[in-house]
Amino acid sequence: MSSSSSSSRCCAAGVFLVPSLLLLPLLLSLIHTAHGATLREHRLSGTEPVSYGPPSQLRPPPSAEMLRALRYIQSLSERTPADPDQSDQDAEDDMESVRSVLKMASPTRREEKDNTQELLQAVLTTLQQTEEHMKTPQKVIAAPRYHQFARPKQQVKVDTDDGNYGRNSWAENRRRYREYPIMFEDDQPLKRTNENAEEQYTPQKLATLQSVFEELSGIASSKTNTKRSDDDEDDEDLYRQRKMVLEDIMGTDDWTPLEEQMESEEEERERHGFTRNLEDDDEDDDGKRSLQSDWLQTQREEEEPEDMAKLVDYYLLQMLEKKEQEQQKRQEEDEEEEVEKKDEEEENVEEREVKPMQSLSEILKISQKLRIPPEELLQLLRNENRKDLPGRTGYAHKTFPSAPHRRPIETSDIAQDILSILELASAAQQNQRPTQARNERYYERQTSRDDYDDTAGEEDELANYLATEMQRHTRMAPLRDEDQPVNLQNYYEKPPAEHENAATGIDNSTMMKILRLLDPESDDADETDSDAGEKVPEM
């Protein structure tokens, strides 16, 4: 029994020891962390306000400017009319707003207890201390070199009034001009005062004051809005409650008097009758519109052919008028062209006309100036006139038979007969060269759309050929009188027949033969050939 009891005790002790052994590492870790997280005093940063630090780090009490700010706040609160019923609620709201501001400004103290009452008591004590300090004279520790000018009492009273808060009288408080100029930058009189002001008015203090003022103004404006909304909601709630009670008592049926019910029924009947009349009027209007549309369609169908005929006539008249106008314009243009041509011809004739007296006088003047006899001047003028004649210049149709890319002109029998008549048989024989292979891409026939005559091309070729032969003959001929010196005696000694032949060059008979060859189908040509019985002379 003793052995069994001892074994059971050992088992029970082991059962209790196992969980304690498991909890040992947790305890050790907690002890280690507790030793590591040693508690120490909170030190403020450069931007954190002094009021949130421990009492050992508190700065000296606020100055007169802080008192003026607090008095200004109290004056603002007094200006707003406060209701006696809701004064307690306003105080509670102000306390809640101050607490919320403190909580927002101090995020590190969210886990700590709410010490708002202690903070308020501290603020009140500081205010009392400042008042006592203001009443009792204090020794001001001045800088070793610089001494502040004492302001008069009137100016101090004006500055410390509640109404003058926020108004800076910097222009009036300027220091007097010194007799001697400043020698160094350290001698500036306002440097030390600026340092003191920076210590008293930090940007955080100013920001907190500004936020307090903004919240106070927002609270004053929100109170009025909330009051109105609350009153409206209360009225609506009362109306709903009364309505619910009446419905529970009287039921959902209408409990209006009989007269009102009768009036409402009559109004409904009148409305129904009015709507029925409107529907009937709409149906009548639809019927009338359908009838009008049918009547208009029939009229249009009847008027369509008449309209088409009128349109056709109208367009025809317009076309005729346009044609007449075009014809008139063409006639006017033709008349203008004819008038211009006549004017040009008259001008040319006037220019060509030579007045004998004026021409002789001009020739004599020129001969006197140039010291040339008048006979030589007349001879020179005659030679120039002969050169300017249109028959002598053959630039109208230029041909280049010697070019390699042109084919030679094939002379027909009629052309040979004409050349023999004109004493050009030798030139025709020289031109008859062996024909080359025709290259069609250089000799494509180009005719206009209106040219349907096949013989026009042949006639043009023949005319060109004759013109070239005439030019060649003139080149091969001996020099004329214009190139050789003129012998007036030989010229006048010649008989008149030679002069006529030189002037005409071709007899009338030869011209008639040329015309017959050009028109072989005419009967008159055959008759004249039979009557004459003459042969063409061959050279």
UniProtKB/Swiss-Prot annotation:
Compositionally skewed regions (Basic and acidic residues) per UniProt: 438-450
Keywords, ordered alphabetically: Cleavage on pair of basic residues, Secreted, Signal
Compartment annotation: Secreted
Predominant localisation class: secreted
Effect of disrupting the coding gene: No effect on development of central arteries. Decreased courtship behaviors and spawning success. Normal gross gonadal morphology in males and females but males produce fewer spermatozoa. Reduced levels of gnrh3 in the hypothalamus and telencephalon and reduced levels of oxt and avp in the telencephalon. Reduced levels of lhb, cga, fshb and gnrhr2 in the pituitary. Simultaneous knockout of Scg2a and Scg2b results in greatly reduced ovulation in females.
Acidic residues: compositionally biased ranges: 85-95, 256-268, 333-350, 520-531
Signal sequence segment: 1-36
Entry's Gene Ontology cellular component terms: extracellular region; secretory granule
Compositionally biased intervals (Polar residues): 427-437
Region described as Disordered: spans on this chain: 76-97, 218-237, 250-308, 325-358, 387-407, 427-456, 517-539
Top-level taxon in the UniProt lineage: Eukaryota
Family of the protein in this entry: Belongs to the chromogranin/secretogranin protein family.
Its job: Neuroendocrine protein of the granin family that regulates the biogenesis of secretory granules. Required for normal courting behavior and spawning.
Protein name: Secretogranin-2a
Species the sequence originates in: Danio rerio
